[in-house]
């Protein structure tokens, strides 16, 4: 990206610091609109790099030089700047961040030049009314609700169904296509079960460790690997429909199949599909591993299917499968 910080760069009139859990892109967006400059124009003035940082997923691809410009321009410590990036989840949510590739749990934006082709950024309409900015958590695959307002997160405009593309909008926090304010988006209540499930995930992410049944995860990455593996066997594969049906019959939920996606990753599902999926995941993983074993056995999800497409499954998951689902027919 940027080779050096421009030596003549002086602080901007905008000196706002990142808000709690704010994404880098959101912080930059607020700066641009506060100074009444189009985001792409401000990006060109600030970075003068090829390719322009804003034509990529800047929350995942911004390097130290990009951060230094923002740090100097807003008089913000570099440590605060780094916390706005998705890479700050490294060793907590995933093992290694991939700046120019797919990272586990990070929802893809499908950026092509200035266009976003995938609903990879979510929002809570009540948060947009109370404290309008985009949170890092809203890019995480298992995040489907706002635990503050107890609402389901949206990944498209409620009026026209366009994806969220902040840099293309003429004003902050409105739809770039129909200009509807995101604060006026549909407010869909989340179930008590899903609010509690997400609170647990957020606590694990913040604390860096987890307990699942009798298994203790000293590093939260190991827990989130297990969570993702259970989500994938519920969402994809020849036995996934039977597994979902079993879970719903035993403990409730919605067995509707998620829309197919070429990536076969839970992060690539839309917000409705992920909400239904993680509702099933939460029901399946209670009383671990008992419910999972009962459901998998009933669905004939034996070891060969449970380990499919994963040469290095999480240890806790692999141990349960090997002990209780060893049949191969």
Where are these regions (language model features)?
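Basic, alpha-helical nucleic-acid-binding regions used in initiation and control of genome expression
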Residues: 1-329
């Amino acid at each position: 990206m940027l080779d050096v910080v421009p030596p003549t760069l002086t602080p901007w009139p905008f000196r706002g610091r990142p808000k709690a859990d704010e994404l880098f892109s959101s912080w930059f967006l607020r700066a641009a609109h506060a100074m009444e400059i189009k985001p792409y124009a401000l990006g060109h003035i600030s970075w003068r790099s090829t390719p322009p940082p804003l034509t990529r997923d800047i929350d995942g691809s911004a390097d130290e030089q990009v951060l230094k410009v923002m740090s100097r321009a807003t008089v913000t410590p570099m440590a605060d700047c780094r916390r706005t990036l998705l890479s700050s989840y490294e060793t907590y949510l995933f093992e290694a961040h991939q700046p120019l590739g797919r990272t586990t749990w990070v929802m893809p934006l499908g950026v092509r030049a200035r266009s976003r082709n995938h609903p990879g950024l979510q929002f809570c309409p009540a948060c947009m009314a109370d404290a309008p900015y985009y949170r890092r958590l809203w890019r995480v695959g298992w995040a489907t609700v706002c635990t503050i307002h107890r609402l389901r997160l949206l990944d498209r405009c409620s009026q026209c169904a366009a994806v969220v593309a902040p840099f293309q909008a003429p004003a902050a926090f409105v739809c770039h296509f129909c200009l509807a304010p995101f604060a006026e988006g549909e407010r869909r209540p989340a179930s008590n079960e899903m609010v509690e499930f997400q609170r647990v995930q957020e606590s694990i992410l913040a604390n860096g460790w987890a307990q699942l049944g009798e298994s203790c995860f000293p590093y939260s990455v190991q827990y989130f690997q297990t969570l993702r593996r259970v989500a994938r066997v519920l969402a994809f594969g020849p036995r996934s429909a039977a597994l979902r049906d079993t879970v719903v019959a035993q403990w409730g939920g919605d067995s509707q199949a998620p829309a197919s996606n070429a990536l076969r990753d839970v992060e690539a599902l839309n917000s409705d599909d992920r909400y239904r999926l993680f509702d099933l995941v939460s029901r399946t993983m209670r009383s671990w591993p008992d419910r999972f074993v009962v459901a998998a056995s009933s669905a004939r999800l034996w070891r060969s299917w449970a380990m499919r497409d994963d040469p290095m499954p999480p240890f806790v998951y692999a141990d349960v499968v090997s002990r209780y689902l060893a049949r191969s027919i």
